């Protein structure tokens, strides 16, 4: 058996599919600001920086569909499609920019 390395992750062989069978949607997002904006994997996308222009109502209750601990950076003037995944669990959102602070429904 090889030596153990603290913090090492040893995944099962094969391919892992993130957020399988979870509802997703794709939105066009544009950074109208003069500074880069970075959004993390678990940030409630509805509550992102107001310099990001997209259909906020559609994004309510969603986060980026990217691996945990990663982020997407939007440079000034950048415009791209992003895939969002619905939040899971009790669907209560607290913090972020304080726009919900309770249940999503």
From Swiss-Prot:
Keyword Aminoacyl-tRNA synthetase (UniProt): no
Annotated pathway: Nitrogen metabolism; urea degradation; CO(2) and NH(3) from urea (urease route): step 1/1
Keywords: Cytoplasm, Hydrolase
Pfam family, one: Urease_beta
Compartment(s) where it occurs, according to its Swiss-Prot or TrEMBL record: Cytoplasm
Uppermost EC category: hydrolase
Known partners and oligomeric status: Heterotrimer of UreA (gamma), UreB (beta) and UreC (alpha) subunits. Three heterotrimers associate to form the active enzyme.
NCBIfam families assigned to the protein according to its UniProt record, in alphabetical order: PRK13203.1, urease_beta
PANTHER family found in the cross-reference section: UREASE
Family statement: Belongs to the urease beta subunit family.
Protein name (record): Urease subunit beta
Natural source organism: Prochlorococcus marinus (strain MIT 9303)
Taxonomy of the source species: Bacteria, Bacillati, Cyanobacteriota, Cyanophyceae, Synechococcales
Gene expressing this chain: ureB
């Amino acid at each position: 058996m090889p030596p153990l390395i603290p913090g090492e992750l040893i995944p099962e062989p094969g391919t892992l599919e993130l957020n399988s069978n979870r509802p997703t949607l794709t939105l066009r997002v544009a950074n109208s600001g003069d500074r880069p904006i970075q959004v993390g994997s678990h940030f409630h996308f509805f509550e992102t920086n107001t310099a990001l222009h997209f259909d906020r109502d559609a994004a309510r209750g969603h986060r980026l569909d990217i691996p945990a601990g990663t982020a997407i950076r939007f440079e000034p003037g950048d415009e791209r499609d992003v895939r969002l995944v619905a939040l899971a669990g009790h669907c209560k959102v607290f913090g972020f920019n304080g726009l919900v602070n309770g249940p999503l429904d």
